[in-house]
């Protein structure tokens, strides 16, 4: 379902945000457990992604609490570097990869905050919106422990159109769907502006948000207009 948000191309029914892109599917999540070693798996996946020349990564997962016996992250740990995933995501940006990740679904819970790697400065963290462009109650919020705005931008994550392995189109809720929706759009934007670095892409997406003049820790910089971002970047080149 996550992949379909980007890659689906069902004529006259459902087209994802980057249907002509090429994809690698890398699994790091152990569905039977929730242990810190899964962050190592994720870091290994990012290393592999770099080795095969991947440009943009979507990750619709994050970690806050683990199985009994393992300590959970604390708010003070959300500094963009403390967790292995956040550190690895920053290294990926240094290597030229744009990492797009889901903010998380803790908005209704006691934790509320974005989950690593979403606290990384050099990651585009995506919150979920309703069709009316209102923040979804479940969507995790910021800020980070060092005072940075999170999430970065927003995308539809309530009643998102998705397609399963059987090809049937349905609807689903979650920042896990907001993230790939935005990821595909970001990939198209970068294709149109190939002279930008990964970090410049992130900055351009933030600056294209409809709340760029008044960002907060619920909506971030808002909904980005990447056509406007494209025009801005082309104008800079003149």
For each feature predicted by the language model, list its residue ranges.
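Subtilisin-like serine protease catalytic core
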Residues: 1-38, 52-55, 68, 94-96, ...
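Hydrolase catalytic cores
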Residues: 3-6, 24-30, 113, 157-223, ...
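Hydrophobic, small-residue-rich alpha-helical packing segments that form membrane-like cores
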Residues: 44-50, 59, 81-82, 109-110
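Active-site-adjacent substrate-recognition loops and nearby beta-strands
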Residues: 39-42, 46, 66-74, 101-123, ...
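Solvent-exposed, polar/charged alpha-helical surfaces in well-ordered, non-transmembrane soluble domains
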Residues: 4, 40, 44-47, 51, ...
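Secreted peptidase-domain scaffold signal
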Residues: 104, 228-238
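Catalytic-core regions built around general acid/base machinery
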Residues: 79-96
